[in-house]
Amino acid sequence: MAQSRDTGNPFPDSGELDNPFQDPAVIQHRPSQQYATLDVYNPFENREPPPAYEPPAPAPAPLPPPSAPSVQSSRKLSPTEPRNYGSYSTQASAAAATAELLKKQEELNRKAEELDRRERELQHVALGGAGTRQNNWPPLPSFCPVKPCFFQDISMEIPQEFQKTVSTMYYLWMCSTLALLLNFFACLARFCVDTGSGSGFGLSMLWLLLFTPCSFVCWYRPMYKAFRSDSSFNFFVFFFIFFVQDVFFVLQAIGIPGWGFSGWVTALVVVGSKPAVAVLMLLVALLFTGIAVLGIVMLKRIHSLYRQTGASFQKAQQEFAAGVFSNPAVRTAAANAAAGAAENAFRAP
């Protein structure tokens, strides 16, 4: 407009006014030609060229998982942690299978020991036989004129499941013998301080000399042979005689005065006048009591084992009859008696 005023033409060329965007102020803010429309124009766009592409660094290799311990360490599960019931059942099944295998292994070992024992017994019989087998009990020195009377080997002759029972009965017999020996010394000590107790001292010597061999022969050996050969007859002999022996064990523990037993009653009678002798007698009474209790327990235990073996009174009768008729002396005596009876019958008028 200022230019028009200078030229003096109030009506400038219409071509200059046809395009209103020719104004310099508008041209200055016109967008560049690289954008076709205003819709794609971004005034905040960075016109600098993008940086060159760099490939990402490779990720580090994952570490190998730690080896699981052979036994899973016990830990307390959190309340929100789910329980692994599947693994528990698997572990329980594995534990049950392991226990079953161990049980079968123990049974196989027991059978192997039994077979080994039988094999050694057969070898022993094949080499010398039962007739030439040397007796080893009682274990006497070689220079002693009295030789052993019995052969005893619990590990070889007794089955594996009964060896502990037979060994316990053998120790019971040894303890009863020791108690009778101590009872003899206690009665001797009392006789030394009281000469009026001579009858008790004499009976204590008799019990020592009588019960020691008789108990071994009458109830221990039948019990040993019963378990060795599963003999019902020997079981019945043992039950009868050992029951009587248990009664004597109880009487020994009671200690009736004048019977030759240093039991509780006799020890309490002496405790007031002879304290030193009473102490020894109380120890013997305590030993008698323990033997009586153990004897009753073992009698009940052996009876339960006897019932498990399938033995019976009929079987005992059959064994007794077979043993009697297989004895050469019995057969000879029976034949002589029959021949004598027949001869007398023919001679009778």
UniProtKB/Swiss-Prot annotation:
Residues 1-168, 298-349 are cytoplasmic. The chain crosses the membrane at residues 169-189, 200-220, 236-256, 277-297. The modification Phosphothreonine is found at T37. GO terms for biological process: intracellular protein transport; response to retinoic acid. Monoubiquitinated. The modification Phosphotyrosine is found at Y41, Y53, Y85. GO terms for cellular component: Golgi membrane. The modification Phosphoserine is found at S32, S74, S78, S87. There is a cross-link at K315 (Glycyl lysine isopeptide (Lys-Gly) (interchain with G-Cter in SUMO1)). Residues 1-90 are annotated as: Disordered. Its main location: membrane. Residues 49-68 have a biased composition (Pro residues). The keyword Transmembrane helix applies. The keyword Transferase does not apply. It comes from the Eukaryota. It is a multi-pass membrane protein. It is found in: Membrane. Functions in post-Golgi recycling pathways. Acts as a recycling carrier to the cell surface. Belongs to the SCAMP family. PANTHER family: SECRETORY CARRIER-ASSOCIATED MEMBRANE PROTEIN 3, SECRETORY CARRIER-ASSOCIATED MEMBRANE PROTEIN SCAMP. Interacts with NEDD4 and NEDD4L and TSG101. Interacts with RNF126. This is Secretory carrier-associated membrane protein 3.
